[in-house]
A protein has these predicted regions:
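Conserved N-terminal beta-strand and adjoining loop/helix that marks the start
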Residues: 1-20, 39, 70
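Structural detector for hydrophobic anchor residues on beta-strands
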Residues: 8-9, 33, 106
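Unchanged
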Residues: 40-63, 73-125, 149-151
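Charged phosphate-binding loop/patch that engages nucleotide di/tri-phosphates or the phosphate backbone
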Residues: 128-151
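Conserved Nudix-box catalytic region and its N-terminal flanking loop in Nudix hydrolases
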Residues: 18-56
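Active-site beta-strand termini and strand-to-loop segments that position acidic
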Residues: 13-16, 24, 87-89
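Residue-level preference for beta-strand/loop junctions
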Residues: 3-5, 31, 79-81
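Conserved S-adenosyl-L-methionine
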Residues: 65-69
Length: 151
């Protein structure tokens, strides 16, 4: 089955030993965690989309630094290619926002690696790779295998 394609961008933002993630409900009634992000608007690039989406979803302003992961997701209504960038916090504290609520986000928070043990997480690199390596300037961009997503 052919699906429309979507280009998206997301931020991987660390603070100490925790990463900034938002929680959604999936189509099966469970939940999943994902770095803040979303589809690019016609008038923006990947960096602008990450800054906008992170602010809308978490109230935190970030500065994207470098691409670390490219993810391909087969979703229920579209196929999505998503560019993930390591970001640094510029300002703000995590809190719920009106935009996040409208989008179906039920939580935004900082998560340690141990807290992700029994979670479905996007991008998978947050589970599959050492965070110190992911944050390193020597990290080589990874293109992840296609993955089915229940959203």
């Amino acid at each position: 089955m052919s699906r429309p394609h979507r280009i998206a961008a997301g931020g991987i933002t660390f603070r100490g030993n925790a990463v900034l993630l938002v929680r959604y409900r999936n189509s099966n009634g469970g939940t999943y965690l994902v770095g803040p992000g979303g589809a690019l608007r016609d008038d923006e690039n990947v960096i602008q989309a990450i800054v906008r989406e992170t602010k809308e979803e978490t109230a935190v302003t970030v500065r994207p630094r470098r691409v670390v992961v490219i993810e391909d997701l087969v979703c229920s209504r579209f196929k999505m290619s998503k560019v993930w960038m390591i970001c640094e916090v510029v300002e703000g504290e995590v809190r719920g926002t009106e935009e996040a609520e409208k989008e179906g986000i039920i939580e935004a928070a900082w998560y340690t690696r141990d807290q992700l043990a029994n979670e479905v997480v996007f991008p998978a690199a947050l589970i599959q790779h050492d965070w110190a390596q992911l944050r390193s300037e020597h990290w080589q961009v990874k293109c992840l295998p296609s993955r089915k997503a229940n959203f």
